[in-house]
Regions:
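Basic amphipathic alpha-helical segments that dock to polyanions
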Residues: 48-50, 55
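N-terminal helix-turn-helix DNA-binding core of bacterial DNA-binding proteins
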Residues: 6-47
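Basic, amphipathic "hinge/linker" alpha-helix immediately C-terminal to the N-terminal HTH DNA-binding motif
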Residues: 72-89
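Beta-hairpin "wing" of winged helix-turn-helix
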Residues: 58-72, 77
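Short, Lys/Arg-enriched, disordered terminal segments
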Residues: 1-6, 101
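Short secondary-structure boundary/capping segments
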Residues: 7, 53, 67-68
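Amphipathic alpha-helical dimerization/coiled-coil segments
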Residues: 84-101
């Protein structure tokens, strides 16, 4: 049960992390996997890419395809809606952290 709860919380935090980086700069999926790994998340492409697709479909991220050395690479960045969500999540997280700690 403990591991399931921790996993659910980490999964939610992944969305915040994606939006955080999408606000700062364009990123591509394999870079995000490595970035998340540096913070202790072990996320597979089979988990990340559907997450990114759903965030694009819901209007939180924009996707741009670029040709890099003959391969198409998908870059992501926040939409205005994504930035609004990020700001809301940061406020909620700040309130929770202040209360719990």
């Amino acid at each position: 049960m403990k591991d399931q709860i921790i996993r659910k919380i980490f999964n939610g935090l992944i969305y915040i992390h994606i939006l955080h980086h999408g606000n700062e700069q364009c990123f591509y999926g394999s870079w995000m996997i490595e970035e998340l790994k540096e913070h202790g998340y072990n996320i597979s492409p089979g988990t990340l890419y559907p997450t990114l697709k759903s965030m694009v479909d819901e209007g939180y991220l924009l996707k741009e395809e670029k040709n890099v050395n003959g391969k198409i690479r998908k870059y992501y960045k926040n939409t205005d809606k994504g930035n609004e969500l990020l700001n809301d999540l940061k406020e909620n997280l700040k309130e929770l952290v202040n209360e719990v700690l």
